[in-house]
């Protein structure tokens, strides 16, 4: 399973660890992902999504029905 938020599309990005001597070694910055069950009142069922913390805030703001409609529009499985 890839580390991608289903709502926002956030993915890992690359950067550098920097030591005190400013040596650079490659690293990955991973999104803050959680598998979370959301209750969909219109369908009377739970839906499990792999979302970032930002994705949860988007769902709080727009509502789960709107977000699921956007996922369906781009043929995302959930």
Swiss-Prot record:
Transmembrane segments: none
GO biological process: translation
GO cellular component terms, semicolon-separated: cytosolic large ribosomal subunit
Gene3D superfamilies (alphabetical): Ribosomal protein L28/L24
Keyword Ribonucleoprotein attached: yes
Keywords in alphabetical order: Ribonucleoprotein, Ribosomal protein
Molecular-function GO terms, alphabetical: structural constituent of ribosome
Top-level taxon of the source organism: Bacteria
InterPro entries documented for this protein: Ribosomal_bL28, Ribosomal_bL28/bL31-like_sf, Ribosomal_bL28_bact-type, Ribosomal_bL28_sf
Pfam families noted in UniProt: Ribosomal_L28
Family matches, as PANTHER family: 39S RIBOSOMAL PROTEIN L28, MITOCHONDRIAL (PTHR13528), LARGE RIBOSOMAL SUBUNIT PROTEIN BL28M (PTHR13528:SF2)
Family, per entry: Belongs to the bacterial ribosomal protein bL28 family.
Full protein name: Large ribosomal subunit protein bL28
Gene name in the database record: rpmB
